[in-house]
């Protein structure tokens, strides 16, 4: 039996703050799928590619700003619209207070379709961006996107390192399949990724001799890394710390330091 580690996305995935800023990337299509492309400043490139798998809000301002920030750290960052134009942000930025939005139906529609779109997209990304043996791939995923990172860290994936924050839809098989270094950034209290399942995740990675690290923040909720309240000093700090930790993790394993 493939036991659940992180439960399916729930109402906690619909909370959080929408951030403000001016994105600097652009959108193009890769195998017919909209892709946000954030590039480093000239001369700052490290030669590697970061795949960005968003939460249920899809490609929206919070993601754009994070991808731009990853790019400023040297990574050409590619964000995938695996909801194919139908993310939650299409309907509302405050879906908890929108009586017309049916989250359960939306999840049913996109659970497997997003997996298929992501797999097709990754294959096309590799064909376009793996231009030499020196190009390496990393992956980052938030909530809905976490399991896609584990897929890309498996024997069938293309990534050499990955990181996830506050995962959902994560089963034991996803973690058993991880063969490359993985970093997890999670809240101390998360109804989707509870203490027992968090401990089990560490047990599996340890049992499999995995290269991993887990960062646990108290007093933040599910979604803090992607939709944290920037007006709250501690929550802003936690969000910034998760980002710095992810970049350091990528840099270490990809030989940028």
What label would you give each PLM region?
Residues 1-257:
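N-terminal cap/leader regions of alpha/beta-hydrolase-fold enzymes
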């Amino acid at each position: 039996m493939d036991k659940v580690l992180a439960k399916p996305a729930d109402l906690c995935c619909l909370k959080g703050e929408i951030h403000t800023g001016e994105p600097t990337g652009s959108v193009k299509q890769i195998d017919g799928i909209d892709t946000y492309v954030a590039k480093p400043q000239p001369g700052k490139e490290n030669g590697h590619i970061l795949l960005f798998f968003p939460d249920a809000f899809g490609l929206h301002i919070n993601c754009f700003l994070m991808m731009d920030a990853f790019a400023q750290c040297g990574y050409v960052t590619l964000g995938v619209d695996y909801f194919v134009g139908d993310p939650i942000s299409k309907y509302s930025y405050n879906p908890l207070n929108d009586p017309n939005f049916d989250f359960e139906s939306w999840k049913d529609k996109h659970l497997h379709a997003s997996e298929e779109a992501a797999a097709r997209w990754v294959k096309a990304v590799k064909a376009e961006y793996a231009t030499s043996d020196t190009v390496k791939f990393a992956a980052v995923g938030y909530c809905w996107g976490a399991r896609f990172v584990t897929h890309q860290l498996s024997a069938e994936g293309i990534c050499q390192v990955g990181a996830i924050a506050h995962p959902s839809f994560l089963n034991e098989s996803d973690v058993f399949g991880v063969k490359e270094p993985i970093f997890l950034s999670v809240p101390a209290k998360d109804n989707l990724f509870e203490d027992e399942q968090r401990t089990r995740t560490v047990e599996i990675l340890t049992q499999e001799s995995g290269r991993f690290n887990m960062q646990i923040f108290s007093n933040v909720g599910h979604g803090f890394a992607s939709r944290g309240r920037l007006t709250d000093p501690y929550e802003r700090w936690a969000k910034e710390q998760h980002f710095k930790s992810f970049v350091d993790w990528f840099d270490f394993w990809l030989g940028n330091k």
